Amino acid sequence: MKSLRLEDAVPQSGSRHRKLRVGRGHSAGQGKTSGRGMRGQKCRSGGGVRPGFEGGQIPLYMRLPKLKGFELVNPSSYTIVNLKQLRDLPADSEVNIETLLDAGILTATSGPLRVLGDGEAHVALQITAAYFTASAREKIEAAGGTCTVEA
């Protein structure tokens, strides 16, 4: 078998095209109008419309409403859990991201744990999280549990 050498490499057939020379006589196939058709803005030198121009009709970018606000470059994401999701946990149990994953309450984490106050705290729980809403903290402590904020 012949070895492969750099000087023997050739481009794939059909991948390279010779530059089309237009306006060089009708026998060349692109003479006279050079493939631009008869008259009109698109046949003129420098002719053509700007991107988004729709012939005088109100263009799409003006028909749509302006978008308010902006998107954060580095948005914060948290793992959210509500009190109603913790109702089946046994009393006086430690609650953190790992125990919630083991219990099947969470299936994945997307950042620090935030406890929200939707629902009721039925049993005393020792919850460790990065953030508690005021209503969640109030309900947990009213049920005899503790809220520990992790750094």
Swiss-Prot record:
<dbReference type="Pfam" id="PF00828">
    <property type="entry name" value="Ribosomal_L27A"/>
</dbReference>
<comment type="subunit">
    <text>Part of the 50S ribosomal subunit.</text>
</comment>
<dbReference type="InterPro" id="IPR001196">
    <property type="entry name" value="Ribosomal_uL15_CS"/>
</dbReference>
<dbReference type="InterPro" id="IPR005749">
    <property type="entry name" value="Ribosomal_uL15_bac-type"/>
</dbReference>
<dbReference type="GO" id="GO:0006412">
    <property type="term" value="P:translation"/>
</dbReference>
<feature type="compositionally biased region" description="Gly residues">
    <location>
        <begin position="26"/>
        <end position="38"/>
    </location>
</feature>
<comment type="function">
    <text>Binds to the 23S rRNA.</text>
</comment>
<dbReference type="InterPro" id="IPR030878">
    <property type="entry name" value="Ribosomal_uL15"/>
</dbReference>
<dbReference type="GO" id="GO:0019843">
    <property type="term" value="F:rRNA binding"/>
</dbReference>
<comment type="similarity">
    <text>Belongs to the universal ribosomal protein uL15 family.</text>
</comment>
<keyword id="KW-0694">RNA-binding</keyword>
<feature type="compositionally biased region" description="Basic residues">
    <location>
        <begin position="15"/>
        <end position="24"/>
    </location>
</feature>
<keyword id="KW-0687">Ribonucleoprotein</keyword>
<feature type="region of interest" description="Disordered">
    <location>
        <begin position="1"/>
        <end position="51"/>
    </location>
</feature>
<keyword id="KW-0699">rRNA-binding</keyword>
<protein>
    <recommendedName>
        <fullName>Large ribosomal subunit protein uL15</fullName>
    </recommendedName>
</protein>
<dbReference type="GO" id="GO:0003735">
    <property type="term" value="F:structural constituent of ribosome"/>
</dbReference>
<dbReference type="GO" id="GO:0022625">
    <property type="term" value="C:cytosolic large ribosomal subunit"/>
</dbReference>
<dbReference type="InterPro" id="IPR021131">
    <property type="entry name" value="Ribosomal_uL15/eL18"/>
</dbReference>
<dbReference type="InterPro" id="IPR036227">
    <property type="entry name" value="Ribosomal_uL15/eL18_sf"/>
</dbReference>
<keyword id="KW-0689">Ribosomal protein</keyword>
